[in-house]
A protein has these predicted regions:
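Domain-scale recognition of functional cores that engage charged ligands
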Residues: 1-232
């Protein structure tokens, strides 16, 4: 089943394209939301009308930060199902901003985190921020730059709303030491802040993607860019 946000037409277009290609190769494609699957004996079962029964494979396109908010909590079966899954939700361990909070425990168990510690800004619980300066708030499971309190990247109304939400729901946020983003100059002499990410398949690098913004925050208003590598 191609699991996606069924109310979003752009998500459905992506799923439909991949599903059509799978159909050409002899597979049957089902399209549903995350709660259209239940789990029995750790096997994924479709509850779609007319398509009830065990399914052979899960392709998850629904973002984890949305999946976790589904009620009732039927989504936990995605984590330990024996049904083969693409885009496995175990990846949330590195997606959540809470990851640094378990580093000490991981290091005690022999896991090396030298690169993480070198590159990731210092991260603490909101309650531990107190009078420390130079920190910003980030949602623990945020996406596309939403609710990140970089003051110069927010208008006054948005900034104040973020601070109010942090006070109401401190456990939904982390405090992270702010770093200064250095913009690059475009050919038309405009400054842009750049974020480059890496695609992986089976834990191996499979390509880059990039987004740029005139503000020092990569959010839903940022532009997508291809990444072209020139080999000498």
């Amino acid at each position: 089943m191609f699991v996606h946000c069924t109310s979003n037409s752009d998500d459905r277009q992506v799923m439909q394209f991949i599903g059509d290609e799978m159909e050409k190769r002899g597979y049957n494609s089902l399209y549903g939301a995350a709660d259209h699957i239940i789990f029995k004996n750790k096997k994924a079962i479709s509850i779609l009308d007319g398509h009830e029964g065990e399914i052979d494979f899960i392709f998850r396109f629904t973002p984890l930060e949305w999946l976790k908010d589904i009620k009732p909590k039927t989504w936990d079966g995605y984590f330990d199902t024996i049904t083969p899954s693409c885009n496995h939700p175990v990846a949330i361990f590195a997606q959540t901003k809470r990851f640094p909070l378990i580093w000490e425990s991981l290091k005690k168990n022999g896991i090396k985190l030298d690169t993480w510690e070198k590159l990731l800004p210092h991260t603490i619980l909101v309650k531990d921020l107190k009078d420390k300066e130079g920190y910003i708030y980030k949602p623990a499971c945020g996406r596309v730059g939403e609710k990140i309190s970089i003051k110069e990247a927010c208008d006054e109304e948005e900034y104040n709303l973020i601070l109010k939400d942090v006070k109401r729901h401190p456990n939904d946020y982390l405090a992270q030491e702010k770093f200064i983003s250095m913009p690059i100059l475009s050919p038309n002499k405009e400054e842009y802040h750049v974020c480059i990410g890496s695609y992986t398949v089976e834990g191996k690098h499979a390509g880059f993607y990039a987004r740029i913004s005139k503000k020092p925050r990569i959010d839903s208003h940022a532009l997508d860019l291809p990444v072209i590598i020139e080999r000498g």
